[in-house]
Every structure is written in C-alpha cells, then in structure tokens.
Regions:
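Catalytic-loop region of hydrolases
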Residues: 1-48
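Short beta-strand element of the alpha/beta-hydrolase
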Residues: 30, 44-63, 67-74, 145
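A fold-wide structural signal in alpha/beta-hydrolase
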Residues: 54, 92-107, 145
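Short amphipathic alpha-helix adjacent to the substrate-entry channel of hydrolases
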Residues: 71-101, 173-174
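C-terminal catalytic histidine-bearing segment of alpha/beta-hydrolase fold enzymes
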Residues: 199-205, 239-306, 396-403, 410-415, ...
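Primarily recognizes the serine-hydrolase "nucleophile elbow" in alpha/beta-hydrolase
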Residues: 132-210, 375-376
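Mobile cap/lid helix-loop segments that gate and shape the active-site cleft of serine hydrolases
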Residues: 22-27, 32, 162-173, 180-181, ...
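Alpha/beta-hydrolase active-site loop
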Residues: 114-136, 446
Length: 454
C-alpha cells in the first residue's frame, strides 16, 4: 500500500479467533498487521519488532456489531464524511509509522448475544490474547494504544478505565479468554458516548429550550454507513420531559466533587449555572481562540470577541445555533426506541430501560429495567479511581464543537475526573468538527510517538 507517496509492505494475519468459546465467530475475530521490515530485523522511526507499540483501533459505531479494521483507503469516520476525499485510514497510517496494528471485531446490540456488556468483554478478550502471545509475535503488548469513535470511543475509554477489573472476570472466563491481563498503555477516544445513565440529564442541561431538532434516523446509527437527519419539533410532552431532566443534572455534577487544575471545585447551581458550566465553555473559547491565533476568521453568534480575544461564550446561544439532534430523553427513550435501549436488552428482552427516570415515565406496557451491574460495566466513569482497576496514564479525547450527539459536558466530566485521579489528559474540542473521528491522524500519531518513546 502507498501512504504519503511511500510504499508500505506488511504481513496480514486476519480472522484470528481470540477466544476459546466463541459465541459469534463472525465478530469475535481479530486482524493483526505487522510491517515487513520487522521480519528483516529492520526498524521504522526508531521502533523495532520487539518494542513497537500496538495500535488497537475498533470500528464500533452505535453499539452495533463491528468487524475488525483493515488497512485501506477510507473517508474519515462520521456523518459528514460522504463527500470527503479517501485517504489512508488509521490502521494504514499506523503501519507506515512502525506500529503493529491489531484490530478486534466485537458483538453488538442487534444480536441477542451482543447486549451489554458483550462488546467491552470482547475487546478485553482480544487484549488478553495479545498479552498472552506477546513473546511469540512482533509488537510490545505492554504498549497497547486503543482508538475508537462515538460508541467506539466510549468502548476505548472503558477499555482503559476498567483494566483488569474483576467485574468482567466471569464473562471473560465463560468466553475462554486467554489467562492474561487486559490493562492497556493509552487511550484515544473521539466523541465518546459515555455515562449513559446520566447523559439524558446532561443533554437537557445543554439543549433545554431548543425545541426544533434534526434527529438521526435510528436505522442509520452505525457510523460506517450513511446517516439521515429527520427534522421535527418537540411535542408538549417532550418539552415537559426536558424541563424535568435539566434540573437533575446539577445534583449529579455536584456529587462528583470534580476539581479543576487549580483545585477549585466544579459545581452547578439549581439553574444549571456555575463553575462547571464555565469549565465547559472554557474549552469552546479555547477552540475559537486557536482559530483566531492562526489568523482564521471565526463566525459564531454565541461568541464575544474583542481585539482578537474571546471574552465570553453564551452556552444557551451555542445550543440554539448548534441545534438539537435528539428528543428527550436522548438516550433512554420512554418508548424504548433508542439504540441504547437495545444495548441494555438481554437474551430474552431486546430493549430495556437503564435509568429510573425513563422507567418511571415509560410509555411501553411491561417495560423492564436493565440490571445495575450491566449498566455499571458500560460506563468508564464508574472505574476511574477504582483501586481494583489498572488505568493508563495517558489519554487523548477529542469532541468537535459541532458535535450534537451528546452534551459537551459528558466528555468534559471524563477528562477532569481522569485528571483528578492522576492521568495526563490531552482534551480539546476541534473547531467546526461534527460527530466524527480519525480526522487529525498527524496529531494523533505525534501524540502516540511522544508517549511511546518517553
């Protein structure tokens, strides 16, 4: 393959079943790619066969089943990518820079055997396979760097936060996963759809009062396929749900006892204002300022700019301009209509609730609630700071300023909670970028290189 004018030779080992007791042989497989130079005792950019980090990208979108990635020409991942030029995907770029690439497929919500926590268990099993076989294959399994977008970004985050945690052990044993650890070296996550049990509140904290929406067609949740926006206006019943959800978020934020870099506690008052809101808007200001400093024009009716400096961000106006994409509740639908409802189903029931709020307001007769343990095992925030989890030191999180798939607050909480527990977090909101991933591969691999050679 040719990357940036350079021909890349590599060996491909595809369709490797990474568990002994495979439940879904179509998805519980891994593709491994190794630069050819490593078989000739060569080195690439300072890496050798023994010490090359392992790049571990997943292709999961919408918590759907996903096959492993292959090195190929592709468009960036996301809804705005149909018109983008095809270029080498992350796996291909990784090979050109000397990384061993291992990409695992995983089960997903549309199958009875792919409900929570199947996808994260599969990714952990794949990591264990790499660790167990470290001595007999190129690449350093103590330097696994995961990467994913949207639900894949959530699972990349969860893989990092929950390393070696005993919660998953019974599931891994049942699959016949290798007897090895599953902690990883670093996490890259684009627009992670996490903290699902609080994401409905977060969405209304940001979008309450924005009553027109453009909703993504539910059949198009997998970000590898074309998505369709359907316009509409909230009903009175939906507005009432939004009004109930918004004031629930401050109590949750205040319960986390988050602190900024100066040690100040991040809080919200009963109206949703406060230091946490300022913390979130600070990242929007930072993104705009970078554009201004680079000499680019910044047009946004929610920004105040004086003498080339951003002086204020109006989050309510930002929400109006960005536009609502989901109807309340955004994730746990009272009619059990969301992809996340299907994620939290089980072998007997395709769709279930996973918040008390939606359960109490359910419009579906006989609706049931997912188990507390399954809900816990899908949220990285539940494992950050848990002494039973081995968490990586290094994290890179990116969410575009045009992303409306979840509240900006969600990724901000992840970033600051990680920092509060000693992690180094590179967190930013790239200007004008929608819900998408792998759009800044030069920067991603520069970050990975710096970590890997420390």
């Amino acid at each position: 393959m040719v990357v940036n004018g350079e021909t890349i030779k590599f060996r491909a080992y595809e369709g490797i079943v990474y568990v002994k007791n495979s439940i879904d042989a179509e998805y519980e497989v891994m593709n491994i790619y190794v630069p050819e130079q490593y078989y000739q005792n060569g080195n690439i950019d300072g890496f050798t066969a023994e010490m090359a980090p392992i790049f571990f990208p997943n292709q999961i979108g919408g918590y759907m089943p996903a096959k492993p990635a292959r090195p190929e020409l592709k468009r960036p991942r996301g809804p705005m990518a149909e018109n983008a030029v095809q270029s080498p995907n992350a796996a291909e770029v990784a090979l050109s820079k000397g990384y061993v690439v291992a990409s695992a497929g995983a089960r997903g919500r549309t199958a009875a055997n792919g409900k929570a926590p199947a996808a994260i268990v599969d990714l952990k099993a794949a990591v264990r396979y790499l660790k167990a076989n470290d001595k007999v294959m190129p690449g350093d399994a103590e330097k696994i760097i995961s990467n994913g977008t949207s639900a894949g970004g959530a699972l990349s985050s969860l893989l990092g936060a929950s390393g070696n945690h005993p919660d998953y052990e019974a599931h891994l044993k049942a699959l016949g996963a290798a007897n090895a650890s599953d902690d990883i070296f670093a996490v890259s996550a684009y627009c992670p759809i996490i903290d699902l049990e609080h994401a409905d509140m977060a969405y209304e904290w940001q979008f309450n009062g924005v009553n027109d929406y453009k909703k993504m067609s539910v059949t198009m949740l997998d970000y590898n396929v074309k998505r369709e926006l359907v316009p509409g206006t909230l009903t009175e019943a939906q507005k009432a749900l939004s009004d109930k959800l918004k004031p629930m978020y401050p109590a949750y934020i205040n319960s986390l006892n988050l602190k900024d870099a100066q040690g100040r506690t991040l809080t919200l008052d009963q109206n949703g204002n406060g230091s946490f809101k300022d913390f979130v808007t600070g990242f929007l200001a930072q993104s705009a300022q970078q554009q201004l400093d680079a000499g680019n024009e910044v047009k946004a009716d929610w920004l105040t700019v004086k003498n080339g400096k951003v002086t204020a961000v109006d989050l309510a106006q930002y929400a109006q301009t960005a536009g609502r994409q989901k109807t309340p509740p955004a994730f746990d639908g009272v009619d059990l209509s969301t992809g996340e409802n299907q994620l939290f189903g089980n072998a007997d029931t395709d769709k279930q609730h996973f918040t008390a709020f939606a359960m109490n307001n359910s419009t579906v007769a006989g609706a049931t609630m997912a188990s507390a343990q399954d809900i816990k095992m899908m949220n990285p925030l539940n494992y950050v700071g848990d002494a039973n989890a081995k968490m990586p030191q290094n994290w890179r999180i990116r969410v575009g300023t045009n992303d409306r798939d979840t509240s900006l607050a969600v990724s901000a909480v992840l970033a600051v909670k990680l920092q509060n527990h000693g992690a180094k977090v590179d967190y930013a909101l790239p200007w004008g970028v929608p819900h998408s991933g792998d759009y800044d591969l030069d920067e991603l691999f520069a970050w990975m290189k710096q970590l890997s050679t420390q």
